[in-house]
């Protein structure tokens, strides 16, 4: 069996290596072609070196092609696995830090809220370039498996405007299912679970064990759980008020809705600072900053570690390898993917990206009809979908009016800021992110003139209600070494 898979964003060592290892764990895939591409040649070469070492040690005769030329990597590829972060750490910092000046306190800022909307402008602009290359040089009908956030926006733009079949993938549903298994005391493989909604706002609308409906037991189970009751306060409150548990982590979910992060003095009531993902202000940004020199400090140590076994024993639960395996071998796989709705969830807009159960085999990807979401869940998702639609259309057409309307309609942004503040904030973010936003050339010129010449709304020297100190490189290294010793 021979075909080609291209990884873009392959300089992201841990995630790219995980996906690569998963794919090569399929015995039939030991003669396929693999190409890695990234804009950072040093990180790209390190990832190639490590993955090639794993191949050689397992006597698999694949030679990885690594190139900074995207089109060369995409040439004749049947599958493109995308895990890029457009703007890197520099762009990410502006997604979090500028909104804080206006009182918007985000934990992550990569999916919705002001940070996610602006991240979407950068990602969509570049991913449409990816799509052009895929159409021109990849195998006809090539599929892009997208891990980049904001996942729904990027997947929507690539399908509608990029004209490349794009499947959005996320692991939130997998983690939530593990939590439900623990709360119920039932092995995960014995649970029959259906999730439906939109990326990072998907709901466990059916949880059954031997035919018994387990959803009525979830609230009491989560409230009684010693760990989850402290770490998942937003998710539990949403479960209490909407009747269904959400797939997304506490910190992520808290910034997608209007209620939990709008008053600084109440934010700590809803979060937990034991782990950044539970709601820390700028938590993911802090961790990313702390790990920014990771390649230089840890790569030699990783090279000294035992090679990965490519026999399937270390295969993760990430969907990408199972999708490719099923399409190529005919084996069956069921997972929850992000796809164009087109009537799958009947009370969400036809033109939107939804996250739903899908079945994969040699005949393709089959998408069963979910029907209506519970009305309250649909209402939450619908508001986010309209933000996504405005943001997608803004990014594709460089329409600054739609961009600012997307920010106005965003639940948390609208709960904290008034329209003039939103207008000024978006102008400031456009100027700060100019290098990644070629579609906004004229709007950025106008924003610069406004910020330089017009009376400005005063902003705050505000660093968030739940911000932790960034650790030094030495502290990070010591903690990592301590974890290895403990393990």
Where are these regions (language model features)?
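NAD(P)-binding Rossmann-fold cofactor-contacting core
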Residues: 28-54
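Short, surface-exposed basic-aromatic patches at helix termini and helix-loop junctions that form
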Residues: 52-57, 82, 136, 156-166, ...
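Short acidic low-complexity segments
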Residues: 63-76
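Redox-cofactor binding/interface segments in oxidoreductases and associated redox assembly factors
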Residues: 75, 81-82, 146
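Rossmann-fold NAD(P)-binding glycine/threonine-rich loop
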Residues: 90-160
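Rossmann-fold dinucleotide-binding core
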Residues: 141-143, 147-213
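Long, compositionally biased stretches enriched for glycine and/or charged residues
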Residues: 185-486
